[in-house]
């Protein structure tokens, strides 16, 4: 009989990280495009604020399970402005990172043997948590443009379906789901009285300046929508683990049970930093967004050198480019070979699909947020000489 953790696979970032253990990259420097996280610390003004905040007694004590009221209120205020409707403070909860927000959502929505629909390729940590929770993942294959089809999703709904989970902008594909597609999924979920979990971790790097969707403008949206967010990317607070969950007050009452049992309260320093960032770093964040968009454009402009070799750019946006390689070699073997031959570390598409799905063997993810436009050109020049 397997334990809960034995029901799932090894974390992909850790697994591919072992490929570089003991390797010498002094002659050919490693290009690491495996992990979607800022490697730089928070901006200096935020670090200085945190240095002062750590002197406050409250920073070191337990706080409310659902997070600091001031941070919940600020999210409600800014989200209401961004999405064009009123979100209440009581509809906002703070979690220890966005992965915990997803875990809490599943604990609140699902029981043993229930089902959640995930578009494939999926964000692997979502699949891992569903495995460990005893919840079945129902794969929803995406189209060639990496957009999930609501009509196909409808055919997958059963009496055990409890939620559809979307990530937009997407991880691993980078694709921004059009508002009409998001709305179609909302209507589908509402019709079947299931939840629509929408993870918007990369919302701050969306290419459009307007509302990415209008879910929050729907009557009684909180009976269907479970919105997830991360402060890790926006303010480089990866190590401080601060996320958010927005849904109905009733559902947050159930989420509170999970959070109180697992972590008691979110990190106080991280919450204070997130609040200060929201109130003081809007212009800085705009600059971060523009830089990510410049790198996205560098991916698009520079990909021709790979297209000529048979590669295909399947999706690009936020922190990611998702590509198809031209070789017969499976992507998990190819990616390990890229480390040895070309000093490139990336994650193969096989790690974004259920076991037995052959689709990922031709695909891989490039997390480009941590490399410059110059390094993007270097990456492509190396990939252009890749071989089996």
Tell where the protein language model's regions lie, with residue ranges:
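PLP-dependent enzyme catalytic core of the Aspartate aminotransferase-like
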Residues: 77, 81, 154, 337-346, ...
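N-terminal small-domain helix-loop-helix segment of the aminotransferase-like
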Residues: 6-97, 104, 278-280, 387-388
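Walker B catalytic acidic pair
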Residues: 200
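Conserved core segment of the aminotransferase class I/II
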Residues: 221-290, 300
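Conserved glycine-rich beta-strand-loop-beta hairpin in the small C-terminal domain of fold type I
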Residues: 275, 292-300, 312-325, 362
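Conserved core of the PLP fold type I
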Residues: 59-187, 204-208, 212-219, 374, ...
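Helix C-cap/helix->beta junction micro-motif
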Residues: 26, 133, 191-192, 342
């Amino acid at each position: 009989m397997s334990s809960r953790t034995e029901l799932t696979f090894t974390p992909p970032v850790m697994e591919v990280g072992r490929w570089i253990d003991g390797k010498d990259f002094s002659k050919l420097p490693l290009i690491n495009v495996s992990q979607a996280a800022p490697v730089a610390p928070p901006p200096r003004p935020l670090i200085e604020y945190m240095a002062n905040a750590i002197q406050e007694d409250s920073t070191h004590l337990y706080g409310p399970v659902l997070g600091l009221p001031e941070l919940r209120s600020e999210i409600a205020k800014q989200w209401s402005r961004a999405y064009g409707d009123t979100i209440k403070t009581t509809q906002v909860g703070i979690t220890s990172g966005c992965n915990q927000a997803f875990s809490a959502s599943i604990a609140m929505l699902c029981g043993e043997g229930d089902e959640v629909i995930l578009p494939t390729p999926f964000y692997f940590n979502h699949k891992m948590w569903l495995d460990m929770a005893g919840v079945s993942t129902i794969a929803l294959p995406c189209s060639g443009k990496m957009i999930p089809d609501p009509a196909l999703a409808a055919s997958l709904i059963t009496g055990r379906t409890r939620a559809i989970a979307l990530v937009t902008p997407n991880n691993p594909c980078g694709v921004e789901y059009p508002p009409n597609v998001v709305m179609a999924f909302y209507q589908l979920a509402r019709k079947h009285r299931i939840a629509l979990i929408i993870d918007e971790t990369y919302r701050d790097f969306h290419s459009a300046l307007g509302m990415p969707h209008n879910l929050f403008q729907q009557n009684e949206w909180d009976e269907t929508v479970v919105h997830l967010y991360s402060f890790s990317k926006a303010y480089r607070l990866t190590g401080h683990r601060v996320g958010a969950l927005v849904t109905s007050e009733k559902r947050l009452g159930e989420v509170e049970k999970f959070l109180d049992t697992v972590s008691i309260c979110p990190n106080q320093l991280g919450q204070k930093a997130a609040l200060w960032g929201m109130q003081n770093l809007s212009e800085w964040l705009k600059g971060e967004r523009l830089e990510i968009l410049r790198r996205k454009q560098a991916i698009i402009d520079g990909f021709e050198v790979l297209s000529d070799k048979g590669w295909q750019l399947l999706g690009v946006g936020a922190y990611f480019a998702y590509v198809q390689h031209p070789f017969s070699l499976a992507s998990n073997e190819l990616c390990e070979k890229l480390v040895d031959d070309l000093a490139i570390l990336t994650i193969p598409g096989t790690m974004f699909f259920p076991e037995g799905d052959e689709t990922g063997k031709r695909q891989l993810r490039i997390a480009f947020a941590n490399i410059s436009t110059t390094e993007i050109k270097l990456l492509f020049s190396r990939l252009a000489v890749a071989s089996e």
